[in-house]
């Protein structure tokens, strides 16, 4: 990563931190209100990052599922950073996004963005990738590990993993001296992580796919643990929509969620085809990734799973987790556990608002599940996604 890229990254991080404050969001919220008034029947406008987290949104567009529901959808907008995603969403340039689940907590309660989670976009789909010579988590002591953002499931999970292995997460300037039991967390764009690992600027990173698969493909890193093997069937990115659409356009909102739920179901049954349509040589060129790397995530060979079990990347084989999977229901127990863990996670910047959050209240207030429940029922219930017919569950951890 060149200096200009690094400066741009820091600028994006600072910009995102400024936007997700009540004062910083005000100008964009004014723009959102103006756009809503000027275009009350706006089409589906998706904003996304080129990661497999976005799969259902892109499949829904590619397969014409929005049109099949009777609503118009523009070509999804490829964005380059979470700062761009948030800015486009808060200002109303896009109206359907996938967003890191902890970022939705920050957006709604830290900056008062009037938006809600309407569904999960996927489960799992992330991993901790380390340098080839590292075989144990404890070996990361005294080194730096990259995360995509402070408000991410990656940050929450990796800090617990470190503590369980006798390591202390810290946040220090680059090249600062570290104690043998300290791990320095640095925020880095996913696309910069494999090169940084290859040049030994970092000892590892935890991030969404396909950047773990890419490190394997380039032979610059190995997967130490999959996040879904530490927090069973955890949400990573969720579907976030504006409250004014949910309240003023409920039929439209229902059709949006219907299309996304059907896209998830289609992807579960057509994993290889999904990898091809997302690839850089697909008709819509949604991502810059090769079909080979995406296949490794969406449709891995059975022999790869055996290798991960032998290496310890998978330690709970009985959970039968996919590398990435898809089910749309936002279980309240997950949101409660997430908020509880965020309170005890090292987060750089102003996070005082977390102290006053009641996990049970957030689970009810942040999420609007009326649409996704209807959508799930229309495709055969939760059993269509391989789940018991219950909208409650118990969170399972295995760090």
Regions found by a protein language model. Name each.
Residues 335-399:
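Conserved C-terminal helix/tail region of periplasmic/extracytoplasmic solute-binding proteins
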Residues 37-188, 196-216, 220-233, 369, ...:
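Short, glycine-/small- and polar/acidic-enriched structural segments
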Residues 101-103, 190-299:
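Pocket-lining segment of extracytoplasmic ligand-binding domains
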Residues 18:
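Short, locally clustered residues in the helix-turn-helix/winged-helix DNA-binding domain
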Residues 1-12, 21-23, 27, 32:
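N-terminal secretory signal peptides
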Residues 25-28, 64-67, 167-169, 344-354:
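Short helix-capping/linker segments at secondary-structure and domain boundaries
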Residues 249-357:
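Secondary-structure end/capping motifs
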């Amino acid at each position: 990563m060149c200096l200009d890229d690094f400066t741009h990254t820091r600028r994006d991080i600072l910009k995102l931190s400024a936007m997700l404050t009540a004062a910083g969001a005000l100008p964009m919220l004014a723009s959102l209100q103006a756009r809503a008034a000027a275009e009350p029947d706006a089409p589906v406008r998706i904003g996304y990052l080129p990661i497999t987290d976005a799969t259902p949104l892109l499949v829904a567009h590619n397969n014409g599922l929005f049109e099949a529901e009777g609503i118009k959808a523009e070509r999804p907008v490829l964005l380059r950073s979470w700062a761009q995603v948030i800015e486009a969403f808060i200002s109303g340039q896009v109206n359907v996004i996938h967003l890191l689940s902890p970022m939705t907590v920050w957006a709604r309660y830290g900056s008062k963005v009037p938006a809600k989670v309407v569904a999960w976009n996927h489960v799992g789909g992330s991993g901790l990738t380390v340098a080839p010579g590292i075989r144990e988590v404890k070996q990361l002591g005294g080194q730096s590990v990259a995360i995509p953002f402070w408000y991410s499931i990656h940050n929450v999970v990796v800090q617990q993993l470190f503590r369980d292995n006798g390591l202390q997460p810290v946040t220090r300037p680059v090249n600062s001296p570290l104690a043998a039991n300290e791990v320095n967390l640095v925020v880095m764009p996913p696309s910069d992580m494999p090169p940084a690992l290859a040049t030994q600027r970092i000892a590892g990173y935890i991030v969404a796919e396909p950047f773990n698969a890419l490190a394997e493909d380039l032979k610059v890193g190995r997967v130490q643990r999959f996040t879904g093997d530490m927090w069973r069937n955890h949400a990573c990115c969720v579907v976030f929509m504006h409250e004014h659409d949910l309240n003023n356009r409920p039929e439209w909102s229902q059709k949006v969620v219907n299309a996304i739920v059907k896209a998830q179901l289609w992807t579960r049954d057509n994993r290889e085809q999904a990898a091809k349509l997302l690839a850089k040589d697909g008709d819509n060129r949604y991502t810059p990734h090769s079909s080979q790397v995406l296949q490794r995530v969406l449709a891995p060979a059975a022999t790869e799973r055996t290798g991960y079990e032998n290496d310890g990347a998978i330690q709970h084989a009985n959970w039968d987790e996919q590398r990435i999977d898809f089910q749309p229901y936002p279980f309240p127990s997950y949101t409660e556990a997430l908020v509880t863990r965020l309170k005890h996670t090292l987060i750089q910047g102003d996070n005082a608002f977390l102290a006053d959050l009641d996990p049970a209240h957030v689970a009810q207030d942040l999420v609007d599940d009326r649409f996704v429940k209807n959508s799930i029922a229309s495709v055969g219930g939760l059993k269509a996604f391989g789940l018991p017919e219950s909208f409650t569950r118990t969170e399972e951890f295995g760090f």
